[in-house]
């Protein structure tokens, strides 16, 4: 199961006493700020969580799996996420506890 934006907003409502509307808006604004930073080419660093980076990928050869035809995969920019040490440690501890 995945954590959704709606569940994040519900947690803000339950744990911090935000109104449901304010909780939803807070979650939307948070993600919009991350989007804007990435769109303008900035790295996003969330201390204790991880970093969102932009990476340019070069054009490379590919193959159509149905026909076997060689086709070029165009150059593109992708978003990558590198978890921070604290997040890695917590996830590793979860595996050890289970």
Curated annotation (Swiss-Prot):
What's a GO biological-process term for it? regulation of DNA-templated transcription
- GO CC entries: cytosol
**Compositionally biased intervals (Basic and acidic residues):** 53-69
Give the record's keywords alphabetically. Answer: DNA recombination, DNA-binding, Transcription, Transcription regulation, Translation regulation
Would the keyword Thylakoid turn up in this protein's UniProt record?
no
Q: Name one Pfam family in it.
A: Bac_DNA_binding
Tell me the CDD domains matching this sequence.
Answer: IHF_A
Residue ranges of the region described as Disordered? 51-71
Span-the-membrane segments of this chain are: none
Which Gene3D superfamilies has this protein been placed in? Answer: IHF-like DNA-binding proteins (4.10.520.10)
InterPro entries referenced in this protein's UniProt entry, alphabetically: Hist_DNA-bd (IPR000119), Histone-like_DNA-bd_CS (IPR020816), IHF-like_DNA-bd_dom_sf (IPR010992), IHF_alpha (IPR005684)
Q: Which PROSITE patterns does this chain map to? A: HISTONE_LIKE
Q: Name one GO molecular function term.
A: DNA binding
Q: Which family does it belong to?
A: Belongs to the bacterial histone-like protein family.
The record's annotation in PANTHER family points to: DNA-BINDING PROTEIN HU (PTHR33175), INTEGRATION HOST FACTOR SUBUNIT ALPHA (PTHR33175:SF2)
**How does this chain assemble?**
Heterodimer of an alpha and a beta chain.
Q: What does this protein do?
A: This protein is one of the two subunits of integration host factor, a specific DNA-binding protein that functions in genetic recombination as well as in transcriptional and translational control.
How is this protein named in the record? Integration host factor subunit alpha
Originating organism: Vibrio campbellii (strain ATCC BAA-1116)
